[in-house]
């Protein structure tokens, strides 16, 4: 009888966790004129089949004490519909049979996935609560083409990989299973058996929409319906987002935030603030400081806090450190209501090699390159995404789309682009593989980045999504259109400007005359790309010192130099980015497990720097001359670029209607009276900004709020004014 109801070979394969097709033996099957039901339920004591109204249809006999049951059930000739009544040692369960359901995913959708369609990733993969034939449950689907068996495990089956082996959908390599009777909130992972027979450590879902909070590592079934039905209130914001060339003409002043440490809750074991708590505190702060955007360091779930988020393992899930995923949607909605844009750092270059993650996901190099000369990053000991693989490229593009669609983010900043573009990045001779032409350019990454930008700027994404590249080399055309051979980004971080100017300011003022070109060189290439000027977290960590600590001199000189630098930066062509804590001149470096030193704001000097940044932001946003032509040479002209003996710089900013702002910077502690400056218009000029104002912590030296441009030629202009230049300060002048 056992041989008739349940083949011994099937039993052995199922119990060993290596059956190639569990649906071929489990669930209902016709045998002559009977319906035979087979079930694998390790630990069960008794199993019966019931009709939907509770009538008994038959008993499933135990055909193997390890948990195999089989029996015939009464039927009316149609498709059998039954429930399994299971007696466990300490519980009773009535459930639909997962193996009574047919295939789940449409063949056409799977074909689109194999062809590299990111929409198919979003449509097919992950854990999705669904209803099938009036039965609620969760559809699981995961890509693992080299595995010989995949099971979904969780609290619902005691994490036993024998209980829910999945169906392989050839040729896509996607495994699927509908588990009835469970829903949102369930914890789960996948158990995979590699081609060589190894049972791998349980893997988190690469496409999970939600996760457990670290250090726990399970994926969580998200309430997809609730996410889709989220009551957004930002239609006006979304429709008004600047499109195409307009996005380059508006002010961008970005406050970069490490959300895990911006504020913590000391009375609750010093935990991180939730998204709702951040909405209450961070949004008003950003708004009050005059920033236009907040940019979060990576928030996709990451296991190691010390990575600051730059080693994510759940590309689709906001970190559970900050509460449920809906909390992030609420944060973005409230930010938009306050007129604040939200950017997120996004990491497509590499991923950590944690056992529960993507590395060797199905026992093979699935997401990474197989050759360590391509697949391992020597600096970070991480795995490099194989973006040349169709499905991997689609997976990453789908992730970017998900952030734009599900959470209405206004843009992504793509991390470590240089490491993607060069095959020999941070590698010695013999440690890298040339491209098909023998060169060092990573052609697959170039194609991926172009595709990413075309997708986010196309009809698939909400209009107005912005992409920013952290690219530290001179790769040409990072912000050029893909149609013209460029990578298609909207903006690129100007790392060269940042390194040069900080190196200049690190010099003692008496020596700055010998390094004058560091401050002017950035204008040689300032309009070759569309730039963001980044004073980011990278510059205030790992022994580099905080911004103010980089400056020489006593405390007053350091603070004054930083204020002058901020005045120079906010007047310089390019959008602005400032890392948290720098806006009030924090003395210590960034520490991911400690908040910024907010107590410094008890000191007037630090409150003054904070007040200056606020006023710079407000003036920058209010004055089109300072932002409308940030990306065009017509918006900038040197007035004084060669006064290296006095370490003085002066330049004019203008918009295309003729509005003017002139910035004058004195980077020595020597006040300079009677300094003649050529000006592009005659008459009365008022001081729009003076970083040496007493309210900012300065000496209040200056020009009593105004100067007069008379008909005395200077610096190539027909008019000029005699100025008093405060020590270590920047002035902004505008025609009255």
From Swiss-Prot:
Presence of the UniProt keyword RNA-binding in the record: no
Transferase in keyword set: yes
Active site positions: 415, 470
Catalysis: reaction(s): Transfers a segment of a (1->4)-alpha-D-glucan chain to a primary hydroxy group in a similar glucan chain
EC number: 2.4.1.18
Assembly: Monomer.
Family: Belongs to the glycosyl hydrolase 13 family. GlgB subfamily.
Protein name: 1,4-alpha-glucan branching enzyme GlgB
Source organism of the structure: Burkholderia cenocepacia (strain HI2424)
Lineage: Bacteria, Pseudomonadati, Pseudomonadota, Betaproteobacteria, Burkholderiales
